[in-house]
């Protein structure tokens, strides 16, 4: 039921507009991370991995590959099961894990592996009031990905990510905020 509501909000302009009006009347700004970057968060995160690994490729080339392989749709983005397919298509090994243990993420980064994490983009924005509203009416849905670059062990600890939905894509989120997302 929650997924159906989310799909309506993503694809039905009139329903989404009504939702935004309701949110605005409650003074809750609407934040759709995936929509703000044309649903390219997966492609751009995989591009960052490929470029870090020395592969010369453009965003447009990756979009064309993903469209041809049916790994990406402009209106919907990239389904979870296809995250990493672009990286694999360039001969790099991808391991998919579905976990919520932050220690696993720490271990992967310490071993020099690249990590793309599925998150609730709104949780990262730090607007807890909006997120409580969204979680109640839409559900807790990880609809955005970030390329995790580093763990900052200072006090308080943080997670440095490349987040294409932000004006300044390289940013450090507080560790507790990242875990919740």
Q: Residue ranges of each PLM-predicted region?
A:
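Active-site-adjacent structural segments surrounding the nucleophilic cysteine of cysteine proteases
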Residues: 1-77
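Conserved active-site-adjacent core of cysteine acyl-enzyme catalytic domains
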Residues: 2-4, 61-181
